[in-house]
Amino acid sequence: MEQLKTIGRELAMGSQGGFGQSKEFLDLVKSIGEARSKAEEDRIVLSEVDILKRRLLEPDIPKRKMKEYIIRLVYIEMLGHDASFGYIYAVKMTHDDNLLLKRTGYLAVTLFLNEDHDLIILIVNTIQKDLRSDNYLVVCAALNAICRLINEETIPAVLPQVVELLNHQKEAVRKKAIMALHRFHRKSPSSVSHLVSNFRKRLCDNDPGVMGATLCPLFDLISEDVNSYKDLVSSFVSILKQVTERRLPKSYDYHQMPAPFIQIKLLKIMALLGSGDKNASDIMSMVLGDLFRKCDSSTNIGNAILYECIRCISCILPNPKLLEAAADAISKFLKSDSHNLKYMGIDGLGRLIKISPDIAEQHQLAVIDCLEDPDDTLKRKTFELLYKMTKSSNVEVIVDRMIDYMISINDNHYKTEIASRCVELAEQFAPSNQWFIQIMNKVFEHAGDLVNIKVAHNLMRLIAEGFGEDDDDADSKLRLSAVESYLQLISEPKLPSLFLQVISWVLGEYGTADGKYSASYISGKLCDVADAYSSDETVKGYAVSALMKIYAFEIASGRKVDVLPECQSLIEELLASHSTDLQQRAYELQALLALDARAVETILPLDASCEDIEVDKDLSFLNGYIQQAIESGAQPYISERERSGMFETTDYHPQDHHEVPTHALRFEAYELPKPSVPPQASNELVPVPEPSYYSESHQPISTSLVSERESSEIKLRLDGVKQKWGRPSYQSTTAASSTTPQAANGISTHSDAGVGSSSSKPRSSYEPKKPEIDPEKQRLAASLFGGSSSRTDKRSSSGGHKPAKGTANKTATVPKENQTPVQPPPDLLDFGEPTATTATAMDPFKELEGLMDSSSQDGGSSDVMGLYSDAAPVTTTTSVDSLLSELSDSSKGNSRTYQPQTSKGPNTKEALEKDALVRQMGVNPTSQNPTLFKDLLG
């Protein structure tokens, strides 16, 4: 019965298309596979893209359908088309709780996105959540995504959780955690520098898979610093020995070879640790010998391990037995019919030649067979081996074979490499000068402009300086052979430009040196070169310079110079050339022909091309001229640095330029909101001292102290700040423009000293334009609050002018007895912040009670408390003259002593509390009627 159910499920899957996919998807794959052209394939894929764009926009797509759509998007991307419109759906699928859908989403995301994509930030939180999952398959899926997508900026978000997973109970999770840390080390070594010890610990893991994964990061670490891991040599050797003895589970075997990939990685690590270390090499020798005996050379994986053993032996200190075993393995490789094994044999032979050159002689015939093999890759590898085998006895044969091969190939890159190797071998092992010149001529002739220009310069320097044996005859023969060979080649129809430059330079320097060839003959050849390659300005420039040298040597030797007609026509042509370089060379040649022998010999000495030229950067030869000019009254030279007045400021910069950036992405969770605390009054930022009143007799002494104390306190600058609450009202504008205390009602106030003392310059250019005040409102305010208006007018009239010191001191010395300072009447229309005054211990309410009593006695001052009574409103037609008279009377009357009296009307404290509440809440008056305060205060 169960078998029938299984068959039924398989038939159902087959009807759907197999593997849970729809028949529509399989038809898509089939149609693309049967496409006969790239255009037909593109048409099918673009049609599928249009279908998916419409399908993905449909609402309430079933998860099974969405999974199929994501797989189809992956298939479209694999074919090289853009499916970026569906990336976000793959990201959303990683959030699904279903394991199959989540893994599908992670697979698609790792294929769609790269580490710098903008959508990476959207899956970081999902990865963090999945790393904490109880299902180890979900954790593995998240770790796979980390190994592909996490960049340097997002490493700190997942690093702590990955480190915790190193101790997970599942070996698959531990293995993938090691792989994730390896990626972190490659992307940002500094982020995991403190976690390197974890790699050492996981090397001893019970699971071979975790241990094998640890070898990869350890290989990178050892490549960077070998000495720090010398203590692990015995551990690696022990692990390799256990692997070769088949102590690992059978599941790690590959083609009956025990854990071959772990063996290969261990051999690479041992090659690094044993380089130049005799003790480490001795420890490794035994297990390496066992590998040569146990490896099966009949399989590719066995040959791979043998090849890695040969590489390891070539790196550590030599051991005769190991070298013999390696030579036998190489012999098997070279005798094989497989080109791959021959290639491995040639490469291994090239490595062992450095240790024992005699090994190559045992395989001469095999090397020649590889050199004649039609496989181009094998032939190139053989030439690399010949290059390493070259010495004086075989240099001619090897270089000739290399030049023949260079002529036969069309690969410019490899042709350039072969040419440079031929030049290098000819310079090191040339048996004669003539052979050297011939080889160089062949290289330049056939490689042409592919030869590096440094090779041409080195050749010219070698011809000029000789072989450095202080043998002038040998050097002369070398130059003569070069001139003769170049005169033969110069008639060739097509020569490379670089070779022509070398020919022109050599003929100009040494064409007439031995007297075998006349100047007219050499100059004629050079003119032919310039005429044949008229489109190449560089060659023509070298030819003109060579003519200049030939004529200079003739003039310096005292011989008569006969300029050939073709040379004269060439000079005339170049004098009118569009090239400034050729024109300059022609003018110099023309001027040189008119000089005498002594001048020419000084300008162009014979065979001085390699003489060292000392450049006097300080122009010390002008010191005498400069001193003479200064003595004659000339101004000394001032350097540009001294003129600009700039100095080095590097000492003032911090030395550590590698500061950790303070602005970075934060991936930790937000803090929970704290319960709200009712605000409390605080005076830490803006302390507002209580008002104090000093007698005029003590004012001069305390003024400076108060100013200094207030200037040191922290205060807000409210001048020029637009008020948010209340109707626009008239405000004083001189608080910031003057630091002189202003007198109000006969008493000097220092409410603005803290602000004004910080700056004595007016801030009108920085303050915003104040709104214009209606004149009717000004008259109303003046009629209601005479004292405040007088103070405002007085400040505005005297703002920006500082009174003389003598006047202030004189006023301060007038004795005043039993005077009680009076607070100016409050400006109830000012709903702004109160101005700061000097702190005092007096009760402000008692002071205001005294103010009311004095106001009731003084007929010249306005009754402030009467505003809160039911008295008739004051008319707004009060004249300005009467207002000024009231101000003068109030200022005079304030000097009298006031006696406290019983106040009439409403309670003073209640009225002030209401007034303070109104100031705080910012209630706007509804009309210009003076009884508005009755509405506000009740």
Swiss-Prot record:
Compositionally biased residues, Low complexity: 728-744, 853-863, 880-891
- Predominant subcellular localization, coarse grouping: Golgi
> Where, in residue numbers, are the HEAT repeats?
118-153, 154-190, 192-227, 234-272, 321-358, 359-395, 397-431, 454-495, 517-556, 562-601, 874-911
Q: Where is the composition biased (Basic and acidic residues)?
A: 764-779
Where would you find the membrane-spanning parts of this chain? none
Query: What keywords would UniProt list here?
Result: Coated pit, Golgi apparatus, Membrane, Protein transport, Repeat, Transport
Ranges of biased composition (kind: Polar residues): 694-706, 808-821, 892-906
* Region entry Disordered, spans: 690-712, 725-867, 880-912, 919-938
Q: Tell me, what's a Pfam family for it?
A: Adaptin_N
Q: Which domain of life is it from?
A: Eukaryota
- Localisation per UniProt entry: Golgi apparatus, trans-Golgi network; Membrane, Coated pit
Q: Does the keyword Transmembrane helix apply?
A: no
Q: Name one GO cellular component term.
A: AP-4 adaptor complex
Q: Biological process GO annotation list? A: intracellular protein transport; vesicle-mediated transport
- What task does this protein carry out? Subunit of novel type of clathrin- or non-clathrin-associated protein coat involved in targeting proteins from the trans-Golgi network (TGN) to the endosomal-lysosomal system.
Q: How does it assemble?
A: Adaptor protein complex 4 (AP-4) is a heterotetramer composed of two large adaptins (epsilon-type subunit and beta-type subunit), a medium adaptin (mu-type subunit) and a small adaptin (sigma-type subunit).
Q: Which family does it belong to?
A: Belongs to the adaptor complexes large subunit family.
* Name this polypeptide is given: AP-4 complex subunit epsilon
- Please report the organism this UniProt entry assigns to the protein: Arabidopsis thaliana (Mouse-ear cress)
